[in-house]
């Protein structure tokens, strides 16, 4: 029973980690995208 339970917990942990990793990279990308246009606008001015 323990052997059957552990793989399920590992799968759940993998799903949680994948979701957290997927969410974390998106926010920095949004921040970078917001910063880049501001820098370009400043250079044009």
UniProtKB/Swiss-Prot annotation:
Give the domain of life: Eukaryota
Cytoplasm found in the keyword field: no
What biological process terms from GO does the record include?
Answer: cell differentiation; spermatogenesis
> What are the UniProt keywords, alphabetically?
Chromosome, Developmental protein, Differentiation, DNA-binding, Nucleosome core, Nucleus, Spermatogenesis
Report the GO molecular function annotations: DNA binding
The terms describing its cellular component in GO are: nucleosome; nucleus
Q: Where in the cell is it found?
A: Nucleus; Chromosome
Which effect does the record note for changing residue 12 to T?
In component II
Q: Where is this region: Disordered?
A: 1-45
Q: What is its main location?
A: nucleus
What extra comment accompanies this record?
The sequence of component I is shown.
Reported function? Involved in nuclear basic protein transition: histones are replaced by spermatid specific proteins which are themselves replaced by protamines in late spermatids.
Please give the name of this protein: Sperm-specific protein Phi-3
């Amino acid at each position: 029973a323990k052997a059957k339970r552990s793989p399920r917990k590992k799968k759940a942990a993998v799903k949680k980690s994948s979701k957290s990793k997927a969410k974390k990279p998106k926010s920095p990308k949004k921040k970078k995208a917001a910063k880049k246009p501001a820098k370009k606008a400043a250079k044009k001015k």
